[in-house]
A protein has these predicted regions:
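Flexible, low-complexity charged segments
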Residues: 1-107
């Protein structure tokens, strides 16, 4: 069974990433949802830790997003998802995070 948790950033689900390209600033709005295995033995404790650790997750998303450019972030969605999954499993020392779903809107 999987429980989905939307990553929140100061009360919003939008994580804004700004890119400067050729003197112009562009933005990517990133939304992230984590899939948690409710049958994992550490689910109860880790789901609380994850919900209380949104700032840490947002920082990880921002760090990962900055590896890309404004023009490549949307096309790199699958790579971003797999990299974030590995990063967050390591950060929270858990396998209960089973998926990371990212949506990117560039402006």
């Amino acid at each position: 069974d999987v429980a989905y948790v939307d990553v929140s950033n100061n009360g919003s689900n939008d994580i804004m990433i700004s890119y400067t390209d050729g003197g112009k600033t562009h933005y990517a709005i990133v939304n992230v949802t984590l899939g948690l295995n409710t049958k994992a033995k550490d689910y109860a404790s880790k789901s609380t830790t994850i919900n209380n650790g949104m700032k840490v997750i947002v920082n990880a998303v921002q760090t990962e997003a900055m590896k890309y450019t404004y023009s490549t972030i949307a096309a790199s969605k699958t790579t971003v998802e797999s990299n974030l999954l590995a990063t967050l499993q390591d950060t929270f020392q858990t396998e209960c995070i089973t998926s990371v779903i990212v949506s990117v809107v560039v402006q």
